[in-house]
Amino acid sequence: MTAHPLAVRLVEHLRGGREIRVLEFASGAGRNTRALREAGLDVTTVDDRTAASAAPFAGVPDGFAAALSTHGLLHGTPATVAGHVSQIARRLAKNGMLYATFGSVRDARFGQGERVDASTFAAAEGDERGVAHAFFDRAQLVALLDPHFAIESLEEHNADEVAGKWAHRQRPLSGAVHWFAVATVLETRR
């Protein structure tokens, strides 16, 4: 399966279930979507253009067993990312799981490009020129997730080794570090 490691973990978690509903936020080129569907999951996608719009969750139903975002929550300001996380939490069923990546302050791109705010920088060149990226330290990311989720695991990974060129058109990432988060929605947030 040429899918992101978090997509693989999601499939392993939901293995054996058929027609289980999964929300994929910012589905990119569809690599993860294909892997999820091949596993028999019923996938609703929010494409990249919609994810970047003013109302990315308009028309998205609720009741999903899991949500996956392997790059959509890297983009925007911390406030934008927090809003997306809240909207995802509202769309998960009881015990629904979030599998997502977030930018780390250890990423080589942190502090590079145009400063949007203390935690957000827009790339000055390359595939993502002008695209704002939010970066978090562990405490900031825990604070962002805690109102909505019980964190199961939160690990930093070298994205160069995990994603490489398949996730970025022109060249592999260089010095990219992402948080991989797996979390269960809190009952009070549904």
Stretches with model-predicted labels:
Residues 82-94:
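A short glycine-rich, Lys/Arg-flanked "PGG" loop and its adjoining helix->strand segment in the class I
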Residues 1-58, 97-190:
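Class I (Rossmann-like) S-adenosyl-L-methionine-dependent methyltransferase catalytic domain
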Residues 65-80:
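A short SAM/SAH-binding and catalytic strip from SAM-dependent methyltransferases
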Residues 26, 46, 70-71, 92:
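Short His-Asn-centered micro-motif
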Residues 57-67:
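A short acidic, Gly/Pro-enriched loop at the edge of an enzyme's catalytic core
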Residues 17, 62, 79:
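Structured loop/turn residues at beta-strand edges in well-structured enzyme cores
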